[in-house]
Amino acid sequence: MRPIIEFCLSNLASGTQKAMEELEKDPNLDIIEYGCLSHCGSCANDKFALVNGEYVSGETNEQLVENIYHYLDENPMF
């Protein structure tokens, strides 16, 4: 089973598209887009994704990608 990275369409439109595109290059990740992830307050202010259901954010796309990989390293699925 691969880690699941979920993005909100509104957050993608606000700037996380490049982070998602970078993560899509990794064949070991499942990337999913949703209309809403119910984090509206955070969505308006942060670049974020849900990683296996947990909120991960970053100030830039590069930091978001880095934080996602850091989270995955610190929280292995098995």
UniProtKB/Swiss-Prot annotation:
Highest taxon, organism lineage: Bacteria
InterPro entries: DUF1450, UPF0349
Pfam hit, one: DUF1450
Protein name as catalogued: UPF0349 protein BH3414
Family from the record: Belongs to the UPF0349 family.
